[in-house]
Amino acid sequence: MKSHTSYLTMNVPARMDFVNITPQVEQAVAGSGVKEGLCLVNAMHITASVFINDDEPGLHDDYKRWLEQLAPYDPSPERYHHNRTGEDNGDAHHKRQVMGREVVVAVTKGRLDFGPWEQVFYGEFDGRRAKRVLIKVIGE
């Protein structure tokens, strides 16, 4: 069985945004030599996410609005107990929990085996600093 690991470094200038990382994931799969297997992609930070959806700007705007309604940004310690530690990103932890940590995509004939419109996205909820994404490809 083959195993290939690579990392992306994300540095999103906005506090919350979504970045299509499908091309980088496809490149990692191609470089792995795996023809049949699995590709794990996960955010390696507790205020970031990796998820699969459509690359449609209106949908991304809807997500941002919806997430902000669920867990509004509020740096004060009143809303989020986490902010009582001196942090100001309690909302970002909640947003990550909703959007998830990772995705696993089948690799078939050396390519990501997506359904229609599916793309891999990095979700940033407390941006303006470097964070890593792990890409792990395993298989034959």
Language-model-derived ranges and their functions:
Residues 1-140:
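Active-site histidine-anchored catalytic micro-motif
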